[in-house]
């Protein structure tokens, strides 16, 4: 069914107008017990917005909680589809990692987090978020200059394997103070 119409069945009148309604890929966000607490509709074409996320409960939009092993290192990416290509990975449903990562204590017992932003070195907003994340002391992947794909999904479509991507991430993950030094170089390369 169309996305607005489907959503209105769950949350009456969430979309008062059904104008420009169209089918979308439905991506369920599940909690640790597997219960759906939100879902995201991804446009199949060039429709805007590309993503619409609907919360069914007042929880942070973290995708993959039902699949993550808390005692293992955890990757944190922007998009749910990207998270499906990495082992032990969650997604925050956008580029804003602040709120979801502020509850990381509830996510992790013995593991650690590595934040993997999309590869958008010319996006000033993403650069600010990367710098902010580095300054918190978290591990961050700074994609190599040779990587031309925008995100993990694009890398897969471009012929990279999951194992190759995970190795690239591993080789290009840094933490303070090395992350700060690498970020300065990375930003200059991509200015």
Regions found by a protein language model. Give the residues of each.
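Replication-associated primase and helicase/ATPase modules
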Residues: 1-18, 28-33, 76, 108, ...
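Short, acidic/turn-prone active-site loops that include or flank metal/cofactor-
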Residues: 94-99, 118-121, 145-147
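Phosphate-handling DNA/RNA-contact segment within nucleic-acid enzymes
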Residues: 1-112, 126-127
């Amino acid at each position: 069914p169309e996305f607005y119409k489907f959503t209105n069945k769950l949350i009456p009148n969430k979309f008062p107008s059904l104008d420009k309604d169209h089918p979308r890929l439905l991506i369920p966000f599940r909690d640790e017990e597997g219960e759906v607490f939100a879902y995201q509709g991804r446009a199949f074409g060039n429709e805007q917005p590309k993503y619409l996320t609907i919360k069914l409960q007042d929880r942070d939009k973290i995708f993959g909680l039902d699949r993550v092993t808390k005692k293992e290192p955890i990757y944190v990416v922007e998009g749910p589809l990207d998270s499906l290509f990495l082992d032990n990975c969650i997604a925050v449903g956008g580029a804003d990692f602040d709120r979801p990562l502020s509850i990381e204590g509830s996510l992790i017992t013995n593991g650690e987090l590595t934040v993997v932003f999309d590869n958008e070195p010319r996006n000033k907003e993403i650069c600010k978020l990367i710098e902010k994340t580095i300054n918190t002391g978290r591990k961050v992947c700074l994609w190599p200059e040779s990587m031309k794909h925008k995100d993990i999904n694009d890398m897969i479509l471009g012929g990279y394997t999951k194992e190759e991507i995970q190795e690239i991430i591993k080789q290009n993950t840094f933490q303070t103070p090395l992350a700060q030094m690498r970020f300065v170089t990375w930003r200059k390369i991509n200015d």
